[in-house]
Protein backbone atom coordinates (compact mmCIF):
# COMPACT_ATOMS: atom_id res chain seq x y z
CA UNK A 1 0.00 0.00 0.00
CA UNK A 2 1.23 3.47 -0.89
CA UNK A 3 2.16 5.72 2.03
CA UNK A 4 -0.16 8.65 2.81
CA UNK A 5 2.51 11.25 1.95
CA UNK A 6 2.85 9.83 -1.58
CA UNK A 7 -0.84 10.37 -2.44
CA UNK A 8 -0.73 14.12 -2.80
CA UNK A 9 0.76 16.47 -5.34
CA UNK A 10 3.17 18.87 -3.70
CA UNK A 11 2.60 22.56 -4.37
CA UNK A 12 6.17 23.08 -5.57
CA UNK A 13 5.80 20.25 -8.09
CA UNK A 14 2.48 21.67 -9.32
CA UNK A 15 3.94 25.18 -9.75
CA UNK A 16 6.94 23.92 -11.67
CA UNK A 17 5.07 21.49 -13.93
CA UNK A 18 1.26 21.75 -14.06
CA UNK A 19 0.59 25.40 -13.31
CA UNK A 20 3.30 26.81 -15.61
CA UNK A 21 0.74 26.89 -18.43
CA UNK A 22 -1.13 30.24 -18.64
CA UNK A 23 -4.40 28.34 -18.91
CA UNK A 24 -3.82 27.09 -15.35
CA UNK A 25 -2.90 30.47 -13.81
CA UNK A 26 -6.41 30.64 -12.32
CA UNK A 27 -5.41 28.11 -9.65
CA UNK A 28 -2.46 30.21 -8.52
CA UNK A 29 -4.40 33.46 -8.82
CA UNK A 30 -7.16 31.97 -6.66
CA UNK A 31 -4.65 30.92 -4.00
CA UNK A 32 -3.04 34.37 -3.91
CA UNK A 33 -6.40 36.17 -4.00
CA UNK A 34 -7.59 34.27 -0.92
CA UNK A 35 -4.29 34.80 0.92
CA UNK A 36 -4.09 38.54 0.23
CA UNK A 37 -7.83 39.29 0.20
CA UNK A 38 -7.88 41.04 -3.17
CA UNK A 39 -7.80 40.07 -6.85
CA UNK A 40 -4.33 39.03 -8.01
CA UNK A 41 -3.12 38.37 -11.55
CA UNK A 42 -0.09 36.25 -12.40
CA UNK A 43 2.43 38.07 -14.57
CA UNK A 44 4.78 35.16 -15.12
CA UNK A 45 6.24 31.98 -13.74
CA UNK A 46 10.00 32.43 -13.59
CA UNK A 47 12.92 30.12 -13.89
CA UNK A 48 14.50 30.53 -10.47
CA UNK A 49 18.02 30.99 -11.75
CA UNK A 50 16.88 32.84 -14.87
CA UNK A 51 16.70 36.25 -13.24
CA UNK A 52 20.43 36.69 -12.82
CA UNK A 53 21.81 39.49 -15.05
CA UNK A 54 25.47 38.43 -14.90
CA UNK A 55 27.57 35.78 -13.23
CA UNK A 56 28.49 37.99 -10.26
CA UNK A 57 24.88 39.06 -9.65
CA UNK A 58 22.99 37.31 -6.88
CA UNK A 59 19.85 35.76 -8.28
CA UNK A 60 16.44 36.01 -6.73
CA UNK A 61 14.81 32.60 -6.34
CA UNK A 62 11.35 33.85 -7.20
CA UNK A 63 9.07 31.26 -8.75
CA UNK A 64 5.98 33.40 -9.44
CA UNK A 65 5.62 37.11 -10.15
CA UNK A 66 2.15 38.63 -9.82
CA UNK A 67 0.46 42.02 -9.36
CA UNK A 68 -2.58 43.26 -7.49
CA UNK A 69 -5.17 45.90 -8.47
CA UNK A 70 -2.85 48.69 -7.23
CA UNK A 71 -0.06 47.35 -9.49
CA UNK A 72 1.95 46.30 -6.43
CA UNK A 73 4.38 43.43 -6.91
CA UNK A 74 3.82 39.99 -5.41
CA UNK A 75 6.72 37.54 -5.48
CA UNK A 76 6.16 33.92 -4.52
CA UNK A 77 8.96 31.51 -3.76
CA UNK A 78 8.72 27.79 -3.11
CA UNK A 79 11.66 26.70 -0.94
CA UNK A 80 12.34 23.01 -0.36
CA UNK A 81 15.66 22.96 1.43
CA UNK A 82 16.76 24.59 4.62
CA UNK A 83 18.99 27.56 4.07
CA UNK A 84 21.11 29.42 6.57
CA UNK A 85 20.18 33.11 6.61
CA UNK A 86 16.86 32.48 4.86
CA UNK A 87 15.26 35.68 6.20
CA UNK A 88 18.19 37.70 4.92
CA UNK A 89 17.77 36.07 1.54
CA UNK A 90 14.08 36.99 1.27
CA UNK A 91 14.96 40.54 2.32
CA UNK A 92 17.49 40.62 -0.53
CA UNK A 93 14.85 39.27 -2.92
CA UNK A 94 12.40 42.02 -1.99
CA UNK A 95 15.06 44.71 -2.34
CA UNK A 96 16.00 43.35 -5.75
CA UNK A 97 12.36 43.28 -6.87
CA UNK A 98 11.95 46.92 -5.82
CA UNK A 99 15.06 48.11 -7.64
CA UNK A 100 14.21 46.13 -10.79
CA UNK A 101 10.92 48.01 -11.08
CA UNK A 102 12.08 51.62 -10.89
CA UNK A 103 14.09 53.44 -13.52
CA UNK A 104 16.74 56.11 -13.12
CA UNK A 105 14.99 59.48 -13.01
CA UNK A 106 11.67 58.14 -11.71
CA UNK A 107 10.32 59.66 -8.52
CA UNK A 108 10.50 57.60 -5.34
CA UNK A 109 6.71 57.82 -5.21
CA UNK A 110 6.80 55.33 -8.11
CA UNK A 111 8.35 52.63 -5.91
CA UNK A 112 5.91 49.72 -5.75
CA UNK A 113 5.06 47.86 -2.59
CA UNK A 114 6.24 44.25 -2.64
CA UNK A 115 4.61 41.21 -1.03
CA UNK A 116 6.95 38.28 -0.45
CA UNK A 117 5.28 34.88 -0.02
CA UNK A 118 7.50 31.96 0.93
CA UNK A 119 6.13 28.43 0.77
CA UNK A 120 8.51 26.53 3.02
CA UNK A 121 8.97 22.77 3.06
CA UNK A 122 11.50 22.94 5.90
CA UNK A 123 11.37 23.90 9.56
CA UNK A 124 12.40 27.55 9.82
CA UNK A 125 12.05 27.77 13.59
CA UNK A 126 9.72 27.53 16.56
CA UNK A 127 6.10 28.54 16.33
CA UNK A 128 2.70 26.88 16.46
CA UNK A 129 1.05 28.42 13.40
CA UNK A 130 1.54 27.45 9.76
CA UNK A 131 1.04 30.98 8.38
CA UNK A 132 3.07 33.97 9.55
CA UNK A 133 2.76 37.57 8.39
CA UNK A 134 5.47 40.20 8.84
CA UNK A 135 5.12 43.90 8.22
CA UNK A 136 7.08 47.04 9.04
CA UNK A 137 5.76 49.79 11.26
CA UNK A 138 7.34 52.56 13.28
CA UNK A 139 6.18 52.53 16.89
CA UNK A 140 6.88 55.31 19.36
CA UNK A 141 9.43 54.14 21.90
CA UNK A 142 7.86 56.13 24.73
CA UNK A 143 4.22 56.43 23.65
CA UNK A 144 3.57 53.23 21.69
CA UNK A 145 1.77 55.18 18.94
CA UNK A 146 2.18 54.30 15.26
CA UNK A 147 3.88 56.89 13.06
CA UNK A 148 1.71 58.18 10.22
CA UNK A 149 3.77 59.87 7.50
CA UNK A 150 2.37 63.06 5.94
CA UNK A 151 3.48 64.35 2.54
CA UNK A 152 2.22 67.18 0.39
CA UNK A 153 1.08 66.04 -3.05
CA UNK A 154 -0.71 68.29 -5.54
CA UNK A 155 -1.71 70.81 -2.86
CA UNK A 156 -3.12 68.06 -0.64
CA UNK A 157 -1.72 66.42 2.45
CA UNK A 158 -1.48 62.67 1.93
CA UNK A 159 -1.17 60.48 5.01
CA UNK A 160 0.22 56.97 4.82
CA UNK A 161 1.23 54.41 7.36
CA UNK A 162 4.67 52.89 6.70
CA UNK A 163 2.90 49.52 6.44
CA UNK A 164 1.24 50.82 3.25
CA UNK A 165 4.66 51.35 1.67
CA UNK A 166 7.09 48.81 3.13
CA UNK A 167 7.13 45.17 2.00
CA UNK A 168 4.98 42.50 3.59
CA UNK A 169 6.16 38.97 4.15
CA UNK A 170 4.17 35.75 4.41
CA UNK A 171 5.84 32.53 5.54
CA UNK A 172 3.74 29.43 4.90
CA UNK A 173 5.09 26.45 6.80
CA UNK A 174 3.73 23.52 4.79
CA UNK A 175 4.93 20.88 7.26
CA UNK A 176 2.72 22.45 9.96
CA UNK A 177 -0.58 21.92 8.06
Regions found by a protein language model. Give the residues of each.
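Elongated, amphipathic alpha-helical interaction scaffolds
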Residues: 1-177
